[in-house]
Amino acid sequence: MAFRRTEGMSMIQALAMTVAEIPVFLYTTFGQSAFSQLRLTPGLRKVLFATALGTVALALAAHQLKRRRRKKKQVGPEMGGEHLGTVPLPILMARKVPSVKKGYSNRRVQSPSSKSNDTLSGISSIEPSKHSGSSHSLASMVVVNSSSPTAACSGPWETRGIEESVTTADGNAESLYMQGMELFEEALQKWEQALSVGQRGDSGSTPTPGDGLRNPETASEALSEPESQRKEFAEKLESLLHRAYHLQEEFGSTFPADSMLLDLERTLMLPLTEGSLRLRADDGDSLTSEDSFFSATELFESLQVGDYPIPLSRPAAAYEEALQLVKEGKVPCRTLRTELLGCYSDQDFLAKLHCVRQAFEGLLEDKSHQLFFGEVGRQMVTGLMTKAEKSPKGFLESYEEMLSYALRPETWATTRLELEGRGVVCMSFFDIVLDFILMDAFEDLENPPSSVLAVLRNRWLSDSFKETALATACWSVLKAKRRLLMVPDGFISHFYSVSEHVSPVLAFGFLGPKPQLSEVCAFFKHQIVQYLTDMFDLDNVRYTSVPALAEDILQLSRRRSEILLGYLGVPAASSIGLNGVLPRENGPPEALQ
């Protein structure tokens, strides 16, 4: 019998196996006859039995020790190579997040107050950390996340070295603040992504009612511990986002207030007066986003034209003179179109309005310009009616009658009385045609009566019936208004005659179900509004003098009319009015008396 040790076998196990082979060796060597002749004493039998039992116990103990040693070797590398991303879920859930100060960034973050009630009901209360986002708190986070003692010991020193290098490279506190804003913004994005991924996972793993009915025990197990942990983690993450949003609103609206206000004032070229300094002091005392919002509102409401000059890109002597008249309250107006025409303020609109009135007054002293504007209006409405597949014959007759009535000097006094009764404060082309007729018509079409909308939105009615009903409604309203006229045959009466042909077409175009006609009417309105916006823009026309402004308005009118008439398929009217005649579709030109 030789002592053998196989590969992969320990010394103790090999010895035990050798001892266990002794009885077999003796039996095979001396034979069964020798054992039959052998007489064992009771003491020897006890020794042999104890030896065999001890050998078996020793083999089992060696096997058990070997299994435990292998298990330790497998667990050791896993714990040593564990990273931050593999931290168990309970540790992540129990970990407290330090508060970080953050300002507003370029991306607008939605506040949790705008979310649903179900989302808000899942927010759990977490005690906020009393530590700031300094290097020490960051180092503590590194120690918690790291299982290596080397990393834990070197964390504070590495963080301190990074902080010193950043401070040396850029000692500006404002730039450091902006870097913190960017880092906190990245953290917000990661937290939002984690929350959205968790919500998608919960919705994707929601068991169906059929599964629960087929196997209730399996369904209850699926909704047990892992799902409750995920739900608790999502609630705490949502609470973290909720507090982060509040920090963002609080510190973003107060910390850089002075520098932001100074940049704003430099951009608008506004001087620092006592009023703005007082508002800045009030802003510095406020800590909530609501206070900051109202203080900003007060600031912009206080930026009046009378106190602060509007930045002018070019000299505008006529505009400055009109602005002085506005300060004295000498520029009346029926309706303020400040926002529609893109003006800085009501005073800015009134000053430009005064200049535009003077420019149109100078333009319409020329007979050819009168004919030009009259012909452009006629061709625009004719093109609209042609696009709507309506005959413009009745409109042309009523339009010529209104135009000839308006150009007679003996009718001007009566026309003034009629228009003053409608709120028109100045007898200018802008106030009568552009504002009273066109802009009021667009406003009426934006807010139609509910009865008209009910007919147009009825799916059971045909388009032809809707068009007929809408035209009947327009005629009924105009007929009722005509009965209340102060002058039965005056300017307003002629205007109503024109409206009887135009109003149904415009109303059905803007409100009706035909997309092609709606597109044409929308383009028509856009060109008119853009024409007025360009007219009230200091960069597009010259407000240096009234003649220069009149010349620019005329060129602007020609350009816009060419665009609109070209879209409607009508010949351009740029050359009309230069020879004092109106071209006719059939027959020779006819001079306008």
Curated annotation (Swiss-Prot):
Gene: MIGA2
Subcellular localization, as worded in the UniProt entry: Mitochondrion outer membrane
Biased composition (Polar residues): 107-123
Positions of modified residues (Phosphothreonine): T206, T273
Protein function: Regulator of mitochondrial fusion: acts by forming homo- and heterodimers at the mitochondrial outer membrane and facilitating the formation of PLD6/MitoPLD dimers. May act by regulating phospholipid metabolism via PLD6/MitoPLD.
PANTHER family attached to this UniProt entry: MITOGUARDIN (PTHR21508), MITOGUARDIN 2 (PTHR21508:SF4)
Protein family per UniProt: Belongs to the mitoguardin family.
A single cellular component GO annotation: mitochondrial outer membrane
Subunit structure: Homodimer and heterodimer; forms heterodimers with MIGA1. Interacts with PLD6/MitoPLD. Interacts (via phosphorylated FFAT motif) with MOSPD2.
FFAT, short sequence motif: residues: 292-298
Keywords: Membrane, Mitochondrion, Mitochondrion outer membrane, Phosphoprotein, Transmembrane, Transmembrane helix
Membrane topology of the entry: Multi-pass membrane protein
Organism whose genome encodes this protein: Bos taurus (Bovine)
Modified residues (Phosphoserine): S132, S220, S224, S228, S276, S295
MF GO annotations: protein heterodimerization activity; protein homodimerization activity
Keyword Phosphoprotein: yes
Chain spans, region Disordered: 101-134, 195-228
Biological process annotations from GO: bone development; mitochondrial fusion
Annotated TM spans: 11-31, 42-62, 563-583
Any Pfam family: Miga
Domain notes: The FFAT motif is involved in the interaction with MOSPD2 and its phosphorylation regulates this interaction.
PTM (free text): Phosphorylation at Ser-295 of the FFAT motif activates interaction with MOSPD2.
Statement: the UniProt record of this protein carries the keyword Phosphoprotein: yes
Low complexity: compositionally biased ranges: 124-134
Protein name (Swiss-Prot/TrEMBL): Mitoguardin 2
Major place of residence: mitochondrion
